[in-house]
């Protein structure tokens, strides 16, 4: 039993030593650019002692920051679920300050700004919030190019809010590269093509939906849209 406890202690100590060594090397590398070799050597033991002394405090602060980010994320989602869109956006913004490369936070932040914009009467304020939503969706995609909800959502903005259907085509094609049976994206892509005057592409999409979809609602909608388009009576919205 004593041998087992000794082995556990040695293993834990070795783990701590390795982590402290890695932390020392990382910090030392930061200073190496502007300190001379003699200066680095002179402060080596001081730095190692500081790391050993403050390691537990540093770990607590890191963990506290993670907990704070989770708090803002959870509160933001609760606000969003209760349709308190600006309060939710503020919480996701706070979480982003801590967890700055998390695509989920940017996606939900974008969703909040987009939904909030619909409540505004002032067109300038509405447009400003739509642009923030666009920026956040694009950041989501930059961080995770396969985030299909963001690809679809930013395309909705480009088609219905920003009148940039050409940009919607770009992101919808990215989405459909990996989700070939995403019929909502197909309908939106057809809409974008129509707005660009590329009606033959839209008809091809409707034919594909009619041929491949097992959903009777999708089939009928595609058939109706195709007929309206062929009869030149398609309603853009």
Task: Please describe what each predicted stretch is.
Residues 16-74, 237:
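N-terminal leader/linker segments that initiate helical-solenoid repeat arrays
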């Amino acid at each position: 039993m004593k041998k087992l406890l000794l082995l556990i202690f040695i293993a834990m100590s070795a783990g701590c030593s390795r982590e402290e060594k890695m932390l020392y090397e990382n910090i030392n590398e930061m200073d190496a650019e502007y300190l001379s070799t003699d200066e680095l050597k002179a402060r080596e033991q001081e730095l190692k002692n500081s790391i050993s002394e403050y390691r537990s405090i540093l770990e607590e602060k890191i963990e506290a920051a993670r907990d704070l980010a989770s708090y803002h994320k959870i509160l933001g989602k609760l606000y969003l679920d209760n349709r308190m869109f600006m309060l939710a956006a503020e919480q996701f913004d706070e979480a982003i300050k801590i967890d700055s490369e998390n695509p989920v936070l940017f996606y939900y932040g974008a969703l909040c700004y987009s939904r909030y914009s619909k409540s505004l009467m002032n067109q300038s304020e509405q447009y400003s919030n739509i642009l923030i939503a666009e920026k956040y969706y694009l950041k989501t995609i930059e961080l995770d190019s396969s985030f299909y909800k963001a690809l679809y959502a930013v395309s909705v903005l480009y088609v219905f809010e920003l009148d940039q259907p050409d940009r919607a085509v770009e992101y919808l094609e990215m989405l459909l590269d990996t989700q070939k049976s995403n019929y909502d994206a197909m309908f939106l892509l057809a809409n974008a093509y129509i707005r660009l005057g590329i009606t033959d592409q839209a008809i091809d999409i409707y034919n594909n939906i009619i041929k491949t979809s097992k959903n009777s609602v999708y089939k009928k909608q595609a058939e109706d849209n195709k007929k309206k388009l062929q009869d030149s009576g398609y309603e853009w919205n």
